[in-house]
Amino acid sequence: LAAVKRQAIRGTVSYDPNIRPALLGTPDEARPHVEAIVALADVVKASDEDLKWLYPDRPIEDVLREWLQSGPSLILCTRGPWGVYILTAAERDMLVVDPLDVELVDTVGAGDSLMAGLISGLVDADLLGSAEAKQRLREASWDQILPAIHRGIITSGITILYQGAYSPTREEVNEILAADKTLRG
């Protein structure tokens, strides 16, 4: 937690709790630690499975709104074939973005690929890195953030086309972006 606090002062922090119940004890034991890091992070990505384990009796949407109020600028919740919930500090409404429509082969690495594509897109949009970028992310509109979200979703969609934790290239992602004008932002 000390390392996260130090980094939060200098620049952006991204966090994926990547819940592994066998390593964390009970939800009641894990929840305070996860919430402390969420409050320090700028970008948070969790899966619906992570949230159902941490908060078994609460609607996911309520948890995401509570997390957003604790400090992050951008929160995503991946929901497999049901797409991604997205909340930002600057926009009032929750957005739901559909997944890429592809034939599933293997979900290993899908969440990590989504986060990699998202972070890459946010860096390209100059919304990550410095304290100034951190403030821009906090104030960013959907128009500024959606291209990075689409990049993340496409990256994840390509990953699940292959067996194992496949990592798509930027060229593979850009091919899909070029083919679909609605994804370019």
Regions found by a protein language model. Name each.
Residues L1-E66, P72, W82-V84, A89:
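Conserved beta-alpha-beta core of the PfkB/ribokinase-like small-molecule kinase fold
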